[in-house]
Amino acid sequence: MKSKCVIIAGEFSADVIGVEIMSAINNIEWYGIGGPLMDAKKLNKFYDWDKISAFGLSDVIFSLPRLYYYASKIADKIIKINPKIIVTVDTKGFNFYLIKLIRQKLKTN
């Protein structure tokens, strides 16, 4: 049985790094968010990465409701999968919030 792992990459440079990580580790069932390179490696996608992408201060501010919504949905999916590890690549602000949210949800369950 393959181990389940989650990887979150929200932009092209993260997709490049993410596919290298996925290629280096065998016998893993990968879940998460990535781009076309990670898709080609059979990533079980939660959502398209445009759901968690925002560039520039004004885009981030206007995207906050969407980012919070998807962070909550992604956290629920990760908790349900119960992965061995969670790998986050780039999109630091979103990923830090996501990990914090997962911890909070696990404490309340």
Residue ranges and their predicted role:
Residues 4-109:
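Active-site and donor-binding regions of nucleotide-sugar-utilizing enzymes
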